Structure formats: structure tokens, C-alpha cells
Amino acid sequence: MIRTTLCFASVLALQVALAGTAGAAETAKAVLSDPDGKEIGTVTLTAVPTGVLLNAELTAFPEGTHAFHIHGTGKCEPPSFKSAGGHFNPEEDRHGLENPAGPHSGDMPNIHVPANGKLHIEMMNQMVSLPGLLEGEGTAIVVHKKGDDYISNPAGDAGPRIACGVINE
């Protein structure tokens, strides 16, 4: 009963927070493609008072742990996706959620894809704003082959980029 009440209270608090931005809520979307150009997921980004809420629907992803980052350039040229640049890092912090001199604004937790290749995730990034992600050269969501170790510079030893999507209004 207590667990149910706490769960309901958490959902209600999130709905109230999002309702406070209704009408004024800004959203953006990134369509993720693999190195062959096949669409394999979408990420919807919603501005909330404390940052950006990311809601991802992934399909046809390889099983395993993968780094999931915001990169600093809004380009996704296959097959390497190097055109997306490094992690979004306007404050020029060190890389890594576990780094005392970090993290980059684009650092986010790893994702864990099951054997069927499908995953729904929601996560908050309190280090970014939607207008900040859309200005200048824009930004992109990038998924790496391996998980981020949360400390190595410059990118967490996460391996090659396996998916990329430009963040657009």
C-alpha cells in the first residue's frame, strides 16, 4: 500500500510539473539512424522547469550496454557520425558522471538494451536547456557501441558511434 501510494505520488508530481509548462512547453525530436541510414529510434525532448526530459523509443538496437550522450554539433553523417563532434560541453568541464571535475552537459547514464533490441527510456538532463541545445550549430543524440565508464576523457571509452540523430524543433 505504501509503495503504491509513493508510486502514485511520484507520477502525480511529474504530471503537475509537466502541466505547469503546458501550452508553453517546448519540444524537440531526434530521429536516430544507424550507420546504414536505417531509422532505429526516436528521442523526444521536452523543456521542463529543471532541464530537459528525454523520452526515447529505440528499436533494432544491439543488445548490451551503450553510452547515450548529447553531442555538440547537429550533424549526423554516416557511417562514423564523427560530424556530431564531441560531447555537448559549453562549460568546458571534464568528462564523466563520476569525475569530480565533470561532467559534460551532454553526459547521461548508459542505456541497457535487451536481446529483442527494443527499449523505452525516460531520463532527465538538468545540465541543459532546450533553447541551448537548438542554438548555434545545434546538437545531436549519439549512442555508442559500448557503455561509458563515466570518467575517461574525452568520451568515456565508449567505442564507435552506432546511432545518431540531430535534435530538431
Show which residues each predicted segment covers:
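N-terminal leader/targeting pre-sequences
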Residues: 20-169
